[in-house]
Amino acid sequence: MGQKINPHGFRLGITTDWKSRWYADKQYADYVKEDVAIRRLLSSGLERAGIADVEIERTRDRVRVDIHTARPGIVIGRRGTEADRIRADLEKLTGKQVQLNILEVKNPESQAQLVAQGVAEQLSNRVAFRRAMRKAIQSAMRQPNVKGIRVQCSGRLGGAEMSRSEFYREGRVPLHTLRADIDYGLYEAKTTFGRIGVKVWIYKGDIVGGKRELAAAVPAGADRPRRERPAGSRPRRSGASGTTATGTEAGRAVGSEEPAAAESATTPEAQSTES
């Protein structure tokens, strides 16, 4: 189940929060439709701005929209002209006063939505999909808060006649663990062969009691007690086959010859001592 469902919806109220915060009784359907229109308006007009997330909060007579972007200069525009235009469009759409907050994303390489958008842009520019996926994984794994990432591309990869899905993964991505902080992003690349869907899952550690675990990852088996080797030498293995020195016919023949040679070597000494 955790492999198929959206990680955000799967963990709502546990480790993730709602992206739209408001209460309505009879106007619930209208507000949901309005939220979808707001997100569609922001995503269609600001493709190059690198929008990672859009949060909407409503009061009785005001709508607050928080835009998390990697390039705030594009959203603000010269002397704030672009921000004023966006605010006017949102007020026309909602019919209420809009408070627009533009927030900068500090680490774009650790945001799943921005990583998916970056891979999709490379696919649109005819970059090989395997190279784009590996480059995104390497950039994300350099971030200290990223413990695992999975990137998946689906569609006519490389212009093939039949569509397929391929993914690369590095580190841990526990999709079925509810306390795991999984960031998820989806973006579509428009190519000459059709659309290619890009999905990204990023694991950022576990959240226990509302706090993220900041302890360093302990290597597997580091806390396991070390067993002391008993005194004496182990039988030597011969080659990569894993056989011991006496595990073959030749080894047993050599082993039987060694005691006879030892007896013949010690017999003269014993005779000299007796005499």
UniProtKB/Swiss-Prot annotation:
Part of the 30S ribosomal subunit. Forms a tight complex with proteins S10 and S14. Residues 38-106 form the KH type-2 domain. Binds the lower part of the 30S subunit head. Binds mRNA in the 70S ribosome, positioning it for translation. Keywords: Ribonucleoprotein, Ribosomal protein, RNA-binding, rRNA-binding. CDD domains: KH-II_30S_S3. SMART domains: KH. SUPFAM superfamilies: Prokaryotic type KH domain (KH-domain type II), Ribosomal protein S3 C-terminal domain. It comes from the Bacteria. This is Small ribosomal subunit protein uS3. Residues 217-275 are annotated as: Disordered. Belongs to the universal ribosomal protein uS3 family. Residues 238-275 have a biased composition (Low complexity). It comes from Mycobacterium marinum (strain ATCC BAA-535 / M). GO terms for biological process: translation.
